[in-house]
Design a protein with these regions (language model features):
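Short catalytic/ligand-gating loop segments at beta-alpha or beta-beta junctions
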Residues: 10-20
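General beta-strand structural signal in soluble alpha/beta enzymes
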Residues: 8-9, 107
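A C-terminal functional module that forms or caps the active site or interfaces directly
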Residues: 19-128
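Internal gly/pro-rich beta-alpha loop/helix module
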Residues: 1-8
Length: 129
């Protein structure tokens, strides 16, 4: 045989030591606090605070765009709601909001199908503080 003896890997059962950075609770977190809201009525802005909106497609239908006088609005998929485009733009848009000088980033949810599952996981991790 060209290969050596087969060795079975042991499963790491340690919850405290993640195997990869992506397993950290806040691995995807920007410096600016991020809050993921499931619906517009969950947003209660504080007076004097500057908010940036991470919008899925900028649609008024979602109810987030017209909800507040946002300091900055960044769209993942401008106008069309395509998950593939949103996934490509995800980290760029998150970084733009993080560097915009807002006090807090408010993220509206993304459809949890296909690529949306991964984006929602990243948004949930980014909202951990």
């Amino acid at each position: 045989p060209r290969f050596g003896k087969v060795v079975k890997a042991k499963k790491n059962r340690s919850v405290e030591v993640p195997e990869a950075p992506g397993q950290l609770a806040s691995h995807y977190a920007p410096v600016t606090p991020l809050r993921l809201l499931s619906k517009p009525s969950d947003f209660n802005p504080e007076s004097g605070k500057k908010y940036g909106l991470l919008s899925y497609c900028g649609s008024e239908k979602a109810g987030f765009i017209g909800l507040h006088d946002w300091a900055v609005v960044e769209e993942l998929s401008p106008g069309n709601g395509k998950l593939a485009e949103a996934a490509v733009r995800f980290f760029y848009v998150l970084r733009m909001l993080d560097e915009s000088g807002v006090d807090e980033i408010i993220a509206e949810p993304v459809s949890e199908t296909g690529l949306g599952v991964a984006m929602m996981d990243k948004l949930r991790r980014a909202s951990v503080r």
